[in-house]
Amino acid sequence: MGGLMVDRRSAGDTISIHPYRRLTPMKLVRDFERRLEKLVDGMAGKVFRGKLHPVELATRLVREADLSVEESGAGPTAANVYGLKLNPRDLDFEVPAGVIHELEQVLESAAADRGWRLDGPVTVTLEPDESVSQGTVSCRVGRSPGLRQPWANLTAETGLKHPIRYNRCTVGRADGSDIGIGDPGVSRVHALLWREGGEAWIVDLGSANGTEVDGSSSTSPLVLTSGSVVRLGPVSFRFRPVSD
């Protein structure tokens, strides 16, 4: 990852982990373009009738997401609601659901790659609007908290699963923790777990009893792999992505 700066703060404060290096949006857009090839082949001319193409919309969405990032209790958090308005001469009224889904997926991928938290599922809407100049896009962003599908789980030795639903999750005993652990040996704000750059990470946030991954402890971020044993003070969990 090229190194991280970690700000450790008390409960209720903002937690910031800033990567020295960030991924370029071009890879995200290229991946999106490849996924869309079959979907929009022979369809793009019917749906996007003007100069605009879905790839341009994907690029705009990633840029708007970047601009929307704010610091929250778990670190950088991006908007998850995006409304795009286009001139009717650029857009067919009947946009295939597959195009919308792929636009939403490029934002999900951007968040996972850059370590952004999303407080709810990503939603993208495309609307025709006569007031928008042909060949341009108007975009509004918003935030709508909601339940996200887990991307991984922390499974306790008892078999109890703690789903990891957000790209950045606070772990601890505090009531507001994304992953609440009731053991008294776990600090109120114990650790931060997140995805970035294609990997999962965890960092101790100045807890009383420390954080270990597969027997290694550190005040710096530690990489999590499928099957990693995560120890938070006296309690242990096994990390497993849902894709496994």
Language model segments and positions:
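Short, Lys/Arg-enriched N-terminal segments with co-localized hydrophobic residues
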Residues: G2-P25
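Residue-level recognition of conserved structural "scaffold" positions that shape functional pockets
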Residues: R9-S10, P19, E127, I179, ...
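Intrinsically disordered, low-complexity acidic Ser/Thr-rich regulatory segments
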Residues: I17-L28, R34-P184, W194, D244
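Forkhead-associated
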Residues: K161-P234
